[in-house]
């Protein structure tokens, strides 16, 4: 009763795992595919650029991107997204239109 047992995980417990780099690449593709359904490409590019600029390695940038986009998608869906993104095209100004400061 007073003896302390060391707990050890058996070596053959569970299926073999894929290498971390492969898991990271697969997860990146999955999260990007899902994110494209809900957010404009300009947002995804900005998040990606932020991750690259604020981490020390490509692996860390991928991890950060996955974390941020996972949270963003979760919040987006929790707020009632119907599951599709419809990108709006920017409206072009009427032909012959010139901005006010552009008088020649």
Curated annotation (Swiss-Prot):
InterPro entries: Lentiviral_Vpx_assoc_factor, RetroV_VpR/X. It is found in: Virion; Host nucleus. The keyword Transcription applies. Gene3D superfamilies: 1.20.5.4730. It comes from the Viruses. GO terms for biological process: symbiont entry into host cell; viral penetration into host nucleus. Transmembrane segments: none annotated. Keywords: Activator, AIDS, Cell cycle, Host nucleus, Host-virus interaction, Transcription, Transcription regulation, Viral penetration into host nucleus, Virion, Virus entry into host cell. One of its GO terms (cellular component) is host cell nucleus. Residues 1-21, 85-104 are annotated as: Disordered. The keyword Oxidoreductase does not apply. Its main location: virion. It holds the Pfam family VPR. Interacts with human UNG. Stimulates gene expression driven by the HIV-2 LTR. Prevents infected cells from undergoing mitosis and proliferating, by inducing arrest or delay in the G2 phase of the cell cycle. Cell cycle arrest creates a favorable environment for maximizing viral expression and production. This is an African mandrill isolate. This is Protein Vpr. The gene is vpr.
């Amino acid at each position: 009763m007073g003896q302390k047992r060391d707990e050890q995980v058996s070596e053959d417990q569970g299926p073999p795992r894929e290498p971390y780099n492969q898991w990271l690449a697969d997860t990146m593709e999955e999260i990007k595919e899902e994110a494209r359904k809900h957010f404009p490409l300009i947002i995804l590019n900005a998040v990606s650029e932020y991750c690259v600029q604020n981490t020390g390695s490509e692996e860390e940038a991928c991890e950060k991107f996955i974390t941020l986009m996972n949270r963003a998608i979760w919040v987006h869906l929790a707020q009632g997204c119907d599951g599709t993104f419809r990108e709006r095209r920017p409206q072009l100004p009427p032909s012959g239109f010139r901005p006010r400061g552009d008088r020649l």
